[in-house]
Amino acid sequence: LKDKKYDQALKAANKALDKTPNHRGAMMCKALVFISEKKYIEADKVLTNLIIFLEKNLEDDDKTGIGTLAAAYANRGIIKDRNKNYEGALKDYARALGIDHEAVAGPGLGTIILNYKFKSSSVRERALYLNEQLQLPEDERVLSIEELDAGQVMHKPGKL
């Protein structure tokens, strides 16, 4: 996935899902491939199914699962953000932060320096910004800046 070999990543995810239908890592991988390919409808469907599955089956002491659930909400928020559904994005960002704020803190400084032209906002920063902007009259809102939004990163729990 990190090497942008999306076809291979999707095949591996589907193979894992054939063996274990609700494999959360494979579901997240599949969603991240779809987001990377701008297939937002498909990504949203996978993330929503992952969220439903995790909310029904997650144990309180499953830190990886909790991080995956937070990342699923954060990534679904990113999709909504990119589709200009800012209220929906804010709800998903807030849910992600409430579940596990550390899991969606964003990339470290080294990753930013090596990979991004602009510093990507964290889920927390984006949620605060959206909340602030949504309080303003519609004609005063600045909800999207294409150049900065392009650098928004997806959230990957653990290694995918």
What are these regions (language model features)?
Residues 1-160:
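Alpha-helical tetratricopeptide repeat
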